[in-house]
Regions:
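Signature for HUH/AEP ssDNA processing cores
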Residues: 1-60, 68-76, 81, 130-137
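Catalytic "initiation/cleavage/transfer" segments centered on a nucleophilic residue
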Residues: 70, 89-131
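Conserved hydrophobic/aromatic beta-strand scaffold that supports enzyme active sites
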Residues: 24-26, 65, 104-106
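Short, conserved acidic/polar surface loops in the N-terminal third of protein domains
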Residues: 37-38, 64, 118-119
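Short Gly/Ser/Thr- and Asp/Glu-enriched loop/turn motifs at secondary-structure junctions
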Residues: 55-62, 99-104
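Conserved short secondary-structure elements within globular domains
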Residues: 78-92
Length: 137
């Protein structure tokens, strides 16, 4: 299985090796009774935009990738604030394992995965592409 870490670039997949935060956060919601209903609620969420949304590899949950503006907050604290907001808006609890910035996630095999339309097939720029002559690590 292929996996990725949505929250940043790392020298090694541990928090202290974080080189650059991606300004993305992966929220994992498990044991969902009605996946399509929750998917629509997340896509229409009042406070958070959706970059990517797909059925988790287990088949009974969703992985929701949202953009974040950390504004000096640590990933862990921002994650907790987002999880509390989601809970306050009546949505299911978020798996707190995502509060670990180094947490990886299996890539989706969901033919119905939502990809934000702002992304095109021919990507012109990528935040993960280092500047000329700059080592990303």
């Amino acid at each position: 299985f292929d996996y990725c870490n949505f929250s940043g670039l790392f020298g090694k997949r541990i928090e202290k090796e974080l080189k650059m935060h991606s300004v993305l956060m992966c929220l994992d919601i498990d044991h969902v009774e009605d996946i399509m209903e929750l998917k629509q609620k997340l896509l229409n969420h009042e406070y958070f935009d959706t970059e990517l949304l797909f059925v988790s590899p287990s088949g009974n949950g969703l992985k929701w990738i949202i953009p974040v503006d950390l504004k000096g907050w640590e990933h862990f604290r921002y994650f907790k604030a987002v999880a509390n907001c989601i809970k306050a808006t009546g949505l299911p609890l978020v798996d707190m394992s995502g509060s670990d910035v180094a947490r990886s996630c299996f890539l989706p095999h969901d033919p119905q995965a939502y990809i934000n339309p702002k992304y095109k097939d021919d990507v012109e720029e990528n935040i993960f592409r280092p500047r000329l002559g700059e080592c990303p690590f």
